[in-house]
Amino acid sequence: MSWAWPVPGVIVTLHLVALALYGLATALTLAPFVGFRPAPRALTIAIPCAGAAVHVVAVSQLTLVGLGPALSMLALCLVLLQLASERLVRGSAVSFFAAPLATGLVGLAILSGLAPGAETVGARNTWFVLHVALSALGLALMALAFIAAALYLLQFRELKARRFGQIFQLFPPLERLDQLNRVALVAGFPALTLGVLLALGYGAQFSGGLHVAKAQIVWGIFTWVVLGWAVWVRVVRHWAGRRAALASIAGFGAVLLVYVALKLTQPGAERFL
């Protein structure tokens, strides 16, 4: 008699544990804004670190094909970037948006289904795994740039109105948020570019590999163009501050809207698009 637990069950359980830890981290992050005392910084870092460790184990068991696995990988990249960025801004303000977003992505991944689908030929190929990982990293960095921009505008509004409440006290200075936005964009563009190039190379090298829908190609190219434009206005045109923040938010919003529009034309939880 075998006592081995089916792999799909293990994957879902690990994601549920990560979801619980991310949810707890979200509650601790939002607590000061609803009147509770801020949690110790060591705790606000340890809990998402534990969630990320469990999440890494879960993702390592996945076949990276379909909507659920893609959302899971994106959530993991976002949490890891959240933890890394807290050192740059010297505070936990990034988790104000990143923690709820990562929690929601993991929840959606579980609801969408994490079991391997029928289209798994070549899914463990190194080219394909790198394509998914780098593409998810590029999107997560774009989301991080959006988060930094949103935090910048919130802090800017508080300063302009001369309100020195919780937002002013808990959010980093504007200069650090602007720097985080720039770093995220500049790092995200090459990551996404490599992800797109690996997808093209994979398709050319392995003609019998995974099917790529036209919607995926359209959205991938559109996202790459938008991210490239955001980097161009920051690096070449030297946009900064409020104008750069608005550009990042507009770009991220456009990418989301196009994704939703394409997804509605081709519904189905078994594929990313």
Language model segments and positions:
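Hydrophobic transmembrane alpha-helical segments in integral membrane proteins
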Residues: 1-25, 138-142
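Alpha-helical transmembrane segments
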Residues: 18, 130-150
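Central hydrophobic cores of alpha-helical transmembrane segments in multi-pass inner-membrane proteins
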Residues: 19-31, 49-58, 73-85, 225-229
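Membrane-interface helix-loop-helix junctions at boundaries between adjacent transmembrane segments
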Residues: 62-138
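Juxtamembrane inter-helical linkers in multi-pass membrane proteins
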Residues: 160-175
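Short alpha-helical packing/oligomerization segments
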Residues: 201-227
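Interfacial loop-to-transmembrane junctions
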Residues: 232-254
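Juxtamembrane boundary at the C-terminal end of a transmembrane helix
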Residues: 257-273
